[in-house]
């Protein structure tokens, strides 16, 4: 299936995305966080890259352990491997953030993730956007296991161009 053959019916995609962000009963999400996520989704739709990948990603970030273990979706199975990448890359920072969240559970946490810079043969520096987005997804997935309200960390740390590179990577690999 090519990306052009995908169903990009905007109302249907938006319905899927909004259904994917439903939290368990008793949970609540800060309206500012929802606004941030919705702005990013709207930007993605306006710029015409595949919002179905975003819907799958948002669904992945809200799935519980049983749903993850029973999934047949290859894209979600790949997303599950990103947690180890995040642990390898961010190490103790993951534990420090989790400690901070446990210490102040009702507070909004600003989480800035660093990027690993690579030196090019021309003595300049670059960041591999796909690898960075994978690590951020893994990091957010770890946070969401504690409390499923930290998806905003993904959208606060990843730029549009980096996200677009990641979407292209997923579409090329699976569609």
Curated annotation (Swiss-Prot):
GO biological process: symbiont-mediated suppression of host cytoplasmic pattern recognition receptor signaling pathway via inhibition of IRF3 activity
Predominant place of localization: host cell
UniProt keywords, alphabetically: Early protein, Host nucleus, Host-virus interaction, Inhibition of host innate immune response by virus, Inhibition of host IRF3 by virus, Inhibition of host RLR pathway by virus, Viral immunoevasion
InterPro entries for this protein: Poxvirus_Bcl-2-like (IPR022819)
Superkingdom as given in the UniProt entry: Viruses
Induction section of the entry: Expressed in the early phase of the viral replicative cycle.
Compartment list: Host nucleus
One CC-aspect GO term: host cell nucleus
Role according to the record: Plays a role in the inhibition of host innate immune response. Within the host nucleus, inhibits activation of interferon-beta promoter by inhibiting IRF3 activation.
Membership in a protein family: Belongs to the poxviridae OPG036 family.
Protein name: Protein OPG036
Species, as recorded: Vaccinia virus (strain Copenhagen) (VACV)
């Amino acid at each position: 299936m090519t990306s052009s053959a995908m169903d990009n019916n905007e109302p249907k995609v938006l319905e899927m995305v909004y259904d994917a962000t439903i939290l368990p009963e008793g949970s609540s999400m800060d309206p500012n966080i929802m606004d941030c996520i919705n702005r990013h989704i709207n930007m993605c739709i306006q710029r015409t890259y595949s919002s179905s990948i975003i819907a799958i990603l948002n669904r992945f970030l809200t799935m519980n352990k049983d749903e993850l273990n029973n999934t047949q979706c290859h894209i979600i199975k790949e997303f599950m491997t990103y947690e180890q990448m995040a642990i390898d890359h961010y190490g103790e920072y993951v534990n420090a953030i989790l400690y901070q969240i446990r210490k102040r559970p009702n507070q909004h946490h600003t989480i800035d993730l660093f990027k690993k810079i690579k030196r090019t043969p021309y003595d300049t520096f670059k960041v591999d956007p796909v690898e960075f987005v994978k690590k951020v997804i893994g990091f957010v997935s770890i946070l969401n296991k504690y409390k499923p309200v930290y998806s905003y960390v993904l959208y606060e740390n990843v730029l549009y161009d980096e996200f677009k590179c990641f979407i292209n990577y997923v579409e090329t690999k699976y569609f």
